Amino acid sequence: NARNRFITNLLPLINNATSLRRVISVFIATLEGEIQMDDFQGWHMKLMANRDHAASITTLSLESHHKDNPKVSFVHNFPGVIKSGITRGTSGVVLTALKAVVRIFGSLFYMPAEEAGDRHVFLSTSARYSAGEKDEAAGVPLSVAPDLSFARGTDGKLASGVYSINASGESAGVKVEDALASLRSRGMTQKVMDTINTDIEKALATKTKA
């Protein structure tokens, strides 16, 4: 909810930008799956189901933002395995065991922080992830690297403005595209945004009363 509020507040400024009208949401892209509306916060799900659920909520919310802001491109990406502290404060047998393994062996498979930063600069600036093939604020043109092409969006079309991207900068596969298409066909995008906006309104109302 917080990142959606953040995006909503910044979109008026982003829309008025003369270059690089883009939003990057770093989370668990390319892992989208089923959404369980009866447990929207994911308190009662198993780990993998929660992952799929949260990934789809993030991607569908970006699709909704893009529908209202077609000149802005939106990238949901998975940063890879990096030392970020994302598991701090978590509990449970599985996560505790996982954190112990990572503490011991993490240095063997962590992506260096500098490389992760470089990859995110690319996501933020390359025309590969533009709002469309004729996007005038697309960023660094594809012509600087002849082997690059427009990325495939979450709807399976090239340069369609919303992207689910893995740690290597590649789009989600057909399985994820099919999962998202199924969610859209059931009106899940609107249900997700209605739930997010209701939660935000409740939080703001509580703060106002306080």
Model regions and ranges:
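Short alpha-helix in the Rossmann-fold core of NAD(P)-dependent oxidoreductases
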Residues: N1-L10, I24, L47-A54
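Amphipathic alpha-helical dimer-interface segment in Rossmann-like NAD(P)H-dependent oxidoreductases
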Residues: N1-T18, E63-K67
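Conserved beta-strand elements of beta-rich interaction domains across eukaryotes
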Residues: L11, T30-L31, P79-I82
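Active-site loop of short-chain dehydrogenase/reductase
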Residues: L13-I35, P70-S73
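NAD(P)H-dependent oxidoreductase Rossmann-fold/reductase module
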Residues: Q36-A210
